[in-house]
UniProtKB/Swiss-Prot annotation:
<keyword id="KW-0808">Transferase</keyword>
<dbReference type="Pfam" id="PF22617">
    <property type="entry name" value="HCS_D2"/>
</dbReference>
<feature type="binding site">
    <location>
        <position position="203"/>
    </location>
    <ligand>
        <name>Mn(2+)</name>
    </ligand>
</feature>
<protein>
    <recommendedName>
        <fullName>2-isopropylmalate synthase</fullName>
        <ecNumber>2.3.3.13</ecNumber>
    </recommendedName>
</protein>
<feature type="binding site">
    <location>
        <position position="13"/>
    </location>
    <ligand>
        <name>Mn(2+)</name>
    </ligand>
</feature>
<comment type="subunit">
    <text>Homodimer.</text>
</comment>
<keyword id="KW-0464">Manganese</keyword>
<dbReference type="Pfam" id="PF00682">
    <property type="entry name" value="HMGL-like"/>
</dbReference>
<dbReference type="GO" id="GO:0003852">
    <property type="term" value="F:2-isopropylmalate synthase activity"/>
</dbReference>
<comment type="function">
    <text>Catalyzes the condensation of the acetyl group of acetyl-CoA with 3-methyl-2-oxobutanoate (2-ketoisovalerate) to form 3-carboxy-3-hydroxy-4-methylpentanoate (2-isopropylmalate).</text>
</comment>
<dbReference type="InterPro" id="IPR002034">
    <property type="entry name" value="AIPM/Hcit_synth_CS"/>
</dbReference>
<dbReference type="InterPro" id="IPR054691">
    <property type="entry name" value="LeuA/HCS_post-cat"/>
</dbReference>
<dbReference type="InterPro" id="IPR000891">
    <property type="entry name" value="PYR_CT"/>
</dbReference>
<dbReference type="InterPro" id="IPR050073">
    <property type="entry name" value="2-IPM_HCS-like"/>
</dbReference>
<dbReference type="InterPro" id="IPR005671">
    <property type="entry name" value="LeuA_bact_synth"/>
</dbReference>
<dbReference type="GO" id="GO:0030145">
    <property type="term" value="F:manganese ion binding"/>
</dbReference>
<dbReference type="Pfam" id="PF08502">
    <property type="entry name" value="LeuA_dimer"/>
</dbReference>
Length: 518
């Protein structure tokens, strides 16, 4: 059976989702989970786009050992050089170069002729091949490119040294038959096509990204580019979990499969959802909360008699299992450590002690600790930079039906250890909290989005708050988790501000290095 390579673009195309702003620690956490999932290639970012992205890609490339790490680059020597510097220490460095090929892009964006685009594509593939053992070349907007011209340029970049050819449906325009036909046409009209792997990259603007990806496989694609939970530009990318399970369950139809560890899908989905702040719809295939729920009486009756009557996928296949162990205030260190191991976390004794102390503090507020609670607890500690910005200390809010909500907040400036306390009022309790935080922080901050959701079921479930703010005109997002909604709201606000302060600090450092170098 044919093996399909899985090229995950959660950290590059996925992070381009509106409102998503991952820091380097969060990107590394996702990359490590993608490695556990068993993807073949991780597209870690766009190294030339910013100093922060460069450093994140570099750290991921140096850390990940069991899959290839790649970065995106325009057909520009500076982009290729930046990608090489970021990726050269990786296990199997590769680059992903792109240039638009459709007439609409050539005319309105590139202002180039077809011949000029061909020359540039060939030149940049040759340049990249001098450094990278594997060069992937993408024809941006291939779906709206005339097939004879697409075949011409594909043939020439293969001769120039490309190892993988990506034919993306950049705007999610094609039907499955139309998209599959592009791969069939390349197989039939490009003489040297057998020297490369063909890759599919589909967007979901018309809701056909997964179907188009499967059609590409049926017509010769060797690699699928996708993102966890289908996140990405506009309506998103093809959902990795849907393609992977479709190949596994229906390999009789597709005659192909991946080598993913499917039992890691649910955990990966949850991690990406938590860190990006993009909630997974309850009815989302494979990983949604309702994916394995049966409510209709007729369905329940059949399911109880024989699961296969209404269930084509077992929950265990994708890592959806009932908690084998309920943790609470009387749970010991051994049970706690065992649960962390089950969840895929490996820590030394000092880290176990630190997290166990945090766990015990949580049990004083919450009767039963779920897997989601543990994951949230650990992630907040692992991915937060505690050297820059403000640390939340305490919050007190007075409000009632006949009172003006008043909040008092205590913070610590983590750079100079200065303690600060302020109070302010607001039209509501959340506004009072944010007005108070605004008085503590000497920045022009504006709240542009606020969302709240429960971590799971139950009256004592942890609250998760996601916010988007502008800090001195620069957009940033943040999240906070606590049992109290107002505390979670305060932490989310500070998290967003601190993220921007970290970015500003990195940028200032880069400017100083540049000034010294010049």
């Amino acid at each position: 059976m044919r093996k399909i390579n899985v090229f995950d673009t959660t950290l590059r195309d996925g992070e381009q989702s509106p409102g998503v702003n991952l820091n380097s620690r969060e990107k590394l956490a996702i990359a490590k989970q993608l490695e556990r999932l068993g993807v073949d290639i991780i597209e870690a970012g766009f190294p030339a786009s910013s100093r922060g992205d460069f450093l994140a890609v570099q750290e991921i490339a140096r850390t990940i050992k069991n899959c290839s790490v790649t970065g995106l680059a325009r057909s520009v020597k500076g982009d290729i050089d930046a990608a090489w510097e970021a990726l050269k220490d990786g296990v199997s460095p590769r680059i992903h170069i792109f240039i638009a090929t459709s007439d609409i892009h050539l005319k309105h964006k590139l202002k180039m002729t077809r011949e000029e685009v061909k020359e540039k594509a060939v030149e940049m593939v040759k340049y990249a091949k001098e450094r990278f053992p594997i060069v992937q070349w993408s024809a941006e907007d291939a779906c709206r490119t005339e097939l004879p011209f697409l075949a011409e340029i594909v043939e020439e970049v293969i001769d120039a040294g490309a190892s993988v050819i990506n034919l993306p449906d950049t705007v999610g325009y094609l039907t499955p038959d139309e998209y599959g036909n592009i791969f069939k046409y390349m197989k039939e009209h490009v003489p040297n096509i057998s020297r490369v792997k063909l890759s599919a990259h589909c967007h979901d603007d018309l809701g056909m990204a997964v179907a188009n990806s499967l059609s590409a496989i049926e017509n010769g694609a060797d690699q699928i580019e996708c993102a966890i939970n289908g996140i990405g530009e506009r309506a998103g990318n093809a959902a990795l979990e849907e393609i992977a399970v479709a190949l596994h369950v229906r390999n009789d139809a597709h005659q192909a499969d991946s080598s993913l560890n499917l039992h890691e899908l649910k955990r990966t989905s949850d991690l990406v959802s938590k860190l990006t702040g993009m909630a997974v719809p309850r009815n989302k295939a494979i990983v949604g909360d309702n994916a394995f729920a049966h409510e209709s009486g007729i369905h329940q009756d059949g399911f109880l008699k024989e699961k296969s009557t209404y269930e084509i996928i077992s929950p265990e296949l994708v890592g959806v299992t009932a908690d084998a162990l309920v943790l609470g205030k009387h749970s010991g260190r051994h049970a706690f450590k065992d649960r962390l191991n089950t969840l895929g976390f490996q820590f030394d004794s000092d880290e176990i002690n630190k997290y166990f102390t945090m766990f015990k503090e949580l049990t004083e507020k919450k009767k039963e600790i779920t897997d989601d609670d543990l994951i949230s607890l650990i992630l907040e500690e692992k991915v937060t930079d505690k050297k820059i910005g403000y640390e939340f200390l305490s919050l007190q809010v007075h409000y009632g039906t006949s009172q003006v909500p008043t909040a008092t907040v205590s913070l610590k400036n983590q750079e100079n250890e200065q303690l600060m306390q302020e109070a302010a009022t607001g039209a509501g309790s959340v506004e009072a909290v944010y007005n108070t935080l605004g008085r503590c922080i000497d920045k022009n901050i504006e709240l542009t989005d606020y969302r709240i959701q429960s971590n799971r079921k139950g009256e004592d479930a942890l609250a998760q708050v996601f916010v988007r703010v502008t800090v001195n005109g620069k957009e940033s997002s943040g999240r906070g988790i606590a049992q109290d909604v107002l505390e979670a709201s305060a932490k989310a606000y500070l998290n967003a501000v601190n993220r921007q302060l970290v970015l500003d600090c990195n940028l200032d450092g880069l400017k100083r290095q540049t000034a010294v170098g010049s």
